[in-house]
Amino acid sequence: MEMCNFAVESADTVFMEVIYEDNHIVVVNKAPGEIVQGDKTGDEPLVETLRRWIKEKYNKPGNVFCGVVHRLDRPVGGLVVFAKTSKALSRLNEMFRNGEVHKTYWALSRNLPELPEGELKGYIRTIEKTNKSLYYASPREGAKEARLRYKVLGSLDRYHLIEVELLTGRKHQIRVQLASVGCPIKGDLKYGDKRSNPDGSISLIARHIEFVHPVSKQRISLDAPVPDDPLWKAAESLKQ
């Protein structure tokens, strides 16, 4: 097992921070604004940057395998797992489907939920044309069940740090479910916050991931550093 934490410069991405790497997987701290897979913008996705990095680092001829296991929304930062082998990709996909990967997110909101911790249950339907998810308290045609657990970790003068554990994986789930209880994420104009963040991000990060390695069977437990921002640094101190 090789633990690493360093930045990789490329022509199209300011940096790529590798948190963990071995022969089968790579875990990257995605910066807000980056895309994991290609989209209609034509911007280079993180998977391609990583593929080029692997090719150059190990002087690999020909095509390099790099499989996308899961994604984060463009304005969200934090941990993303990639597979370096087809065996790892197949097993990780199965683990994600079976709920065997534990992911924890941190969010900043101007508002507090009614209870300091709890579980949110509802239904989400995604409108692809507008790239937005709609939330319903009861079942609706075309909507899928969405569940998460949350806990308020602490409060600053104007913002509150909320820890979220996803129990299902729906598009924009954390964003829409926190907004449904009056707690839109800081900077998330799409789901009800009133002011954007200067860098276009929203104040949501994939903070922690834990799973059994798909090949070695060792337990992997990783944390993403919080963004280099005074508000996030202050929020992080609430947990210490």
Give the ranges of each region predicted by the language model.
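RNA pseudouridine synthases
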Residues: 1-240
